[in-house]
A protein has these predicted regions:
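Alpha-helical transmembrane segments of multi-pass small-molecule/ion transporters
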Residues: 1-313
Length: 313
């Protein structure tokens, strides 16, 4: 039992250590908000696209593209979205329903989920995680735009605006470019692949430090019952339902592990940006991000420990 616990911590500790290093570096003023802003732009526009591109380009797509996993993840995301929206209608004021829904279903899969998948399953985790990440970006941006627009008159929600935001996303572009090149086994020069590797290796440490640097303890202190309610839905109920459903559908090993990590990842930082753009309750959005990220350090370890103890991953 102790050996299994240590094995679980060896998987998750490097990820959360980098995240809390960001908190510490911000606290001792080695990084500031300007660093986080610029570094986040570098990650989003350059490093993360390189990581996703190479993850797919080097992948054996016959093994990385799992139609059953993809279909289940799509269904789980849509069900999670519907449950979150239903809970929002039941539990919170109309003005905050879009923020509640987005906070409860939109996970930080592109950074924390992918980092944990890579830590647990190595290159295969990155390959399958990259495929799911491309899908996640499409779904999260579309569904978030819809639910926020319903409760905000300031956010554009016409199909053209949604499609433009999705297909101008560097992460989507990298996935769309890499997939046919991987299938066609298009050769690239070694110097270009090596340079891309340098950028890709920067991605997860830098992104995790940035997330840590943007966590606001003031937002945590100011969080109320509503933020805690959303966080419990995101970090306990949806992962429990989603992972149990995956287990009942027969998923085991890496597939079940990655589904758990993606469904159980904390709320994405992008939810705060979209809340501001919609003139919504961005303080609530910030509180949800902080609480779910802190909860993830506990729930992820418990989930992996139970799945490994049962011999399911």
């Amino acid at each position: 039992m102790l050996a299994l616990l240590i094995q679980t911590l060896n998987i998750t500790a490097p990820v959360f250590a980098m995240l809390f290093m960001g908190v510490l570096l911000k606290r001792i003023h080695l990084i500031d908000d300007n660093f986080n802003r610029v570094a986040s732009q570098l990650v989003f526009n350059v490093c993360m696209p390189a990581l996703l591109f190479l993850g797919i380009y080097h992948a054996d797509l016959a093994s990385a593209v799992k139609p059953g996993v993809i279909l289940y993840f799509v269904v789980a995301t849509l069900v999670g979205f519907a449950v979150a929206w239903g809970m929002a209608i039941w539990r919170c004021p109309r003005a905050d329903r879009g923020i509640y829904t987005q906070g409860a279903f939109r996970g930080n899969n592109g950074v924390i989920g992918l980092a944990l998948a890579a830590s647990l399953y190595g290159d295969y985790g990155i390959s399958l995680g990259a495929v799911l990440a491309g899908l996640v970006i499409l779904m999260y941006n579309s569904l978030s735009a819809v639910v926020l627009a319903v409760y905000s008159p300031d956010l554009k929600s016409d199909p053209w605006s949604i499609c433009k935001s999705i297909f101008s996303n560097p992460l989507i572009i990298s996935v769309l470019v890499a997939t046919p090149m991987a299938y066609g086994q298009v050769p690239l020069p070694n110097w270009l692949l090596t340079s891309g590797d340098y950028l890709a290796q920067m991605t997860l440490p830098l992104a995790l430090i940035c997330i840590g640097g943007t966590l606001s303890l003031a937002a945590l202190r100011d969080s109320g019952k509503l933020a805690i309610d959303v966080s419990l839905v995101k970090m306990v109920w949806l992962p429990l339902i989603g992972t149990l459903g995956a287990w009942l559908c027969g998923f085991r090993g890496a597939e079940l592990g990655i589904l758990f990590l993606y469904i159980g990842s904390p709320t994405a930082a992008a939810s705060y940006v979209m809340a501001r753009a919609a003139n919504g309750n961005h303080e609530l959005a910030a509180s949800i991000i902080v609480i779910t990220t802190l909860m993830a350090a506990i729930t992820t370890n418990i989930g992996i420990f139970i799945l490994q103890w049962g011999g399911w991953i």
